From Swiss-Prot:
InterPro entries: Homing_endonucl, Sporu_reg_WhiA_N_dom, Sporulation_regulator_WhiA, Sporulation_regulator_WhiA_C, WhiA_LAGLIDADG_dom
Full protein name: Probable cell division protein WhiA
Segments of this protein annotated with the region Disordered: 308-329
One Pfam family recorded for the sequence: HTH_WhiA
Superkingdom assignment: Bacteria
Lineage: Bacteria, Bacillati, Actinomycetota, Actinomycetes, Propionibacteriales
Family: Belongs to the WhiA family.
Organism: Cutibacterium acnes (strain DSM 16379 / KPA171202)
Gene (UniProt): whiA
PANTHER family: CELL DIVISION PROTEIN WHIA-RELATED (PTHR37307:SF1)
């Protein structure tokens, strides 16, 4: 299965409990998949075109559950140059109301050119939800390699720059560029792509991405290839992804209360996902031993798990998909 389709299929099933995140995802999907249209210069309609059935079902269900509006679905079978099936979600009656509720219209009734205010002013969870919606609408992910990239096709420069800002809020570097009069937002760094997949909730896709990425890196080096077999590669990739996902969850649980020295260790784990503990210790300022950096990460996870249990929330391990819980490295 192509990586893009795998990611979109997984994102279409990510459970989201917080209302603000569901609103942000809906708004971003509508903004990047189509948006507002005027019919006969009078009637405002909402239209969104996506390329997977899962994304279409998720958007329709979310709009109904969050805002109480029903939408129409038109399936456009591919033909000629456009061979892929497309799914058009349309709302004619009540379109203006939905546009205002999602922030696609500002207070004066004008279309928003960037991202809606609730997303821009929302927390990190809303920024991740916006990226999830944008990817479901117009995202793609290429195979690991020299030209690897996660890319979102944007409806305009303002929307592209707003999405770059959302990534920055997530500590991920994304860049806006124009190609053939089309605005795009691109993430090219391999670790940053893994981080964004994790933040969007595509945990299984992260495993596939890291597995393919690590395999390619090893094939490029005869010495490294001699030191690893396939089982070790998979185990190493899965353990690195699992550790990073747990650290990411730990930092979310603790928020501003995490001690600085534990936060620094956690950030290093996220910034250098494939690095060994010894390598992490060397890039720490000041340098730490392998045991010292490992101890700080263990204390970070233990503190987060204790806090989560006291708050009745899933721990860093319980928040992982079942298939990842045995890959703790």
């Amino acid at each position: 299965m192509a990586l893009t389709l795998q990611v979109k299929n997984e994102l279409a099933t990510v459970p989201v409990q917080k209302l603000c995140c569901r609103r942000s995802e809906i708004a971003a999907t509508l903004r990047f998949a189509g948006g507002i249209h005027l019919v006969q210069h009078r009637h405002l309609t909402i239209e969104a075109e996506v390329d997977t059935g899962g994304a279409a079902r998720r958007l329709r269900q979310s709009i109904q559950e969050v805002f109480g509006f029903d939408t129409d679905l038109v399936v456009v079978n591919g033909a000629g140059l456009h061979s892929n099936t497309r799914y058009l979600i349309r709302m004619v009656r009540g379109g203006a109301d939905l546009a205002r509720l999602t922030g696609l219209l500002d207070r004066r009734g004008r279309p928003v050119r960037g991202l809606p205010v609730p997303i821009v002013g929302g927390g990190r969870c809303c920024q991740a939800a916006a990226w999830r919606g944008a990817f479901l609408a117009r995202g793609s992910l290429t195979e690991p390699g020299r030209s690897m990239a996660m890319e979102i096709t944007a409806p305009g420069e303002e929307a592209a720059m707003a999405l770059v800002g959302a990534a920055r809020r997530l500590d991920i570097t994304a860049k806006q560029r124009e190609s053939r009069h089309v605005d795009r937002v691109t993430i090219r760094d391999g670790d940053a792509i893994s981080a964004m997949l994790t933040r969007m909730g595509a945990h299984e896709s992260v495993l596939a991405w890291e597995d393919r990425r690590l395999r390619r890196e090893v094939r490029a080096s005869a010495n490294r290839l001699a030191n690893f077999d396939d089982a070790n590669l998979r185990r190493s990739a899965r353990a690195a992804v699992t550790a990073s996902a747990r650290v990411e969850r730990a930092l979310e649980i603790l928020g501003d209360s995490v001690p600085d020295h534990l936060r620094a260790a956690g950030r290093l784990r996220l910034e250098h996902r494939n690095a060994s503990l010894e390598e992490l210790g060397k890039v720490h300022e000041p340098p730490l031993t392998k045991d010292a950096i490992a101890g700080r990460i263990r204390r970070l996870l233990a503190l987060a798990d204790k806090t989560a249990r006291s708050n009745g929330e899933p721990t860093t391990l319980e928040s992982l998909p079942v298939e990842m819980r045995d890959d703790r490295g």
